[in-house]
């Protein structure tokens, strides 16, 4: 996949001359935070397009991703990338997964974390959670999927002003030094261990 050539080995934007030679790829998102994270890894060749796409209600993250990706391609007719994220909470048996957006809208990140911690304490399932990210490239003839997984625990009260979504209540594993939530991490460090950074690098390597 030529437009991602070399991106798997870098955590910063590609050189300007390479950006000029490479075709621009659409990232389907209306979220500027997601575009910023992707550009930190793959460079400015990504440009955002905001489409109002139907979201199928499924606990299968790949099924949701593929439905979204091919519908987006049908509408714009250009090579593009779509992203989906699931948040699997141990105390809820892996729920909400891809439906986390609706739980966050209903409860907020702190409410979600407090509910999970209460159930986990009562049932002995703990405070663990898995952040799972998938990105899909579609060009009309083929699809390529990148996946990233970050294991961690939920914490309250929220910590940190960075990030978005559940970032301030998710304490990822794999950090050196003091434990910090996604919301407390600088961009490059979050990219290194986070589920989205892993997923983008996995896609870039294909």
What are these regions (language model features)?
Residues 8-9, 40:
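Intrinsic disorder/low-complexity segments in short proteins, especially the signal peptide
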Residues 3-4:
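Aromatic (phenylalanine/tyrosine) cluster motif
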Residues 9-10, 18:
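Short, positively charged and aromatic/hydrophobic N-terminal segments
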Residues 15-26, 33-206:
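Anionic-ligand binding patches
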């Amino acid at each position: 996949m030529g437009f991602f050539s070399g991106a798997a080995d870098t955590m910063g934007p590609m050189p300007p001359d390479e950006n000029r030679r490479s075709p621009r790829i659409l990232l389907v998102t209306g979220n500027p935070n997601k575009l910023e994270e992707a550009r930190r890894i793959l460079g400015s060749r990504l440009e955002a397009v905001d489409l109002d796409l139907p979201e199928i209600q499924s606990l299968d993250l790949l099924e949701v991703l593929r439905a979204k990706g091919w519908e987006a391609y049908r509408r714009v007719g250009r090579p593009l990338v779509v992203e989906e994220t699931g948040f699997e909470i141990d105390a809820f048996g892996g729920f909400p997964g891809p439906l986390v957006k609706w739980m966050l809208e209903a409860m907020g990140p702190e409410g979600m974390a407090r509910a999970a911690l209460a159930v986990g304490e009562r049932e002995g399932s703990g405070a663990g959670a898995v952040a799972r990210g998938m990105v899909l490239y579609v060009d009309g003839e083929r699809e390529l999927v990148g996946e990233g997984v970050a294991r961690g625990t939920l914490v309250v009260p929220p910590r940190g002003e960075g990030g978005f979504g559940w970032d301030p209540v998710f304490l990822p594993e794999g950090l050196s030094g003091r434990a910090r939530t996604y919301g407390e991490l600088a961009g490059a460090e979050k990219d290194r261990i986070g589920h989205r950074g892993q997923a983008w690098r996995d896609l870039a390597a294909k």
